[in-house]
Amino acid sequence: MDKLIIKGGKKLIGEVSVSGSKNAALPIFVSTILAPGLNEIRNVPFLRDINTTIKVLESLGAVVEGNGNIVRIDTTHVNNVEATYDLVKTMRASVLVLGPLLARHGRARVSLPGGCAIGARPINLHLKGLAALGADIRLEHGYVEAKAKKLKGARINFDISTVGGTEQLMMAAALAKGETVLENAAREPEIIDLAEILIKMGAKIDGAGTDTIRITGVKELAPVAHDVMPDRIEAGTFMVAAAITGGDIKIRNMKLEHLDALVFKLQDAGVEITNRDNVVRVKGPRRPKAVNIKTRPYPGFPTDMQAQFMALMCVADGASVISENIFENRFMHVSELLRFGADITVEGSTATVKGVKKLSGAPVMATDLRASASLILAGLAADNTTEISRIYHLDRGYESIEKKLAGLGADIQRVKE
């Protein structure tokens, strides 16, 4: 197993380029099931979750070839409708194959998913929505079994904003008979990216990016080529890396408008952010100011940036209050940040962070994907050496992050334990 060794205290200086978005790429890959033939997906990041998705698609009958950041997916012979536990258990997004398989073949058998250990993340909203489209849904022996001769459009109001649920039903409804209206739909940029490839394929979708999405079903979809959007969470992580080290970096291949809530909070903390010719410059202060945050569905502050922002607040001047309103059990990084000398107290879904002048390097252990990033950030800012173990979480969502940080002057290396 690999671990990261970081010798902290260096300001990050230079330029870095953001990879394609994992959270956009996964549903885009799955959407190719709906369009039999050869689809080409570009700007694909090299990540463990991408490889898992490829294995799921191959198990269903797809032929997948990769060349650099371009992946070609031939879904002509996707005739198997079962995604087994061995494949699905490692990644929650695998459950997204349910809707497309149901829409294309009229049946699907998909194992209940695994993935990050962040609360329950129930898929009941997916299943409730598919049932509203006319599917017969049963849970048997850890599998979701779904059947429908032909899905039919319906009006579906989500109890809570759900990114996966919105993606699932947008794909399923693309081939349903009649109009489907998704109310209280998720508004994330990744939803828009998925809608864009579906529209290229021939789907009729209006309102992606708003809380009401209308999908008029069509008889068939055709294969296409598509570029995955930049990863806004990776971009945000680099922004915080510049801020926490007092650095000065330029970030390419990012869309700043996807991170408005984070940008406002970083600016409140004293970080200078400018956008010129689609290159974002981030200049960290001598010491950040304490700022309160509350995670919200997009366009609010992203839950996937909460852990990284907490690391920044650990060295801020003053006390900050961080409220996690999206996922339960998403403060697992706190116990590890305390090992750096951070001053954090947790009560329910709220953490109070009293900034200290300096963190001290320590041996720590990653617990999930974004927690891994927060520990790297703390290590970059800390005195002495930090060792981070269990970094396999990191490889699920960040493409060569240690190489990119080293390119900005960080003293960071991956070694075998």
UniProtKB/Swiss-Prot annotation:
UniProt xrefs under InterPro entries: Enolpyruvate_Tfrase_dom, Enolpyruvate_Tfrase_sf, MurA_subfamily, RNA3'P_cycl/enolpyr_Trfase_a/b, UDP_GlcNAc_COvinyl_MurA
Q: Which PANTHER family match?
A: UDP-N-ACETYLGLUCOSAMINE 1-CARBOXYVINYLTRANSFERASE
Pathway as given in its UniProt record: Cell wall biogenesis; peptidoglycan biosynthesis
Which Pfam families does the protein's record reference? Answer: EPSP_synthase
Protein name in UniProt:
UDP-N-acetylglucosamine 1-carboxyvinyltransferase
Q: What is its EC number?
A: 2.5.1.7
Q: Which residues bind UDP-N-acetyl-alpha-D-glucosamine?
A: 92, 304, 326
Catalytically driven reaction(s): phosphoenolpyruvate + UDP-N-acetyl-alpha-D-glucosamine = UDP-N-acetyl-3-O-(1-carboxyvinyl)-alpha-D-glucosamine + phosphate
Protein function? Cell wall formation. Adds enolpyruvyl to UDP-N-acetylglucosamine.
Say which species the protein is native to.
Answer: Geobacter sulfurreducens (strain ATCC 51573 / DSM 12127 / PCA)
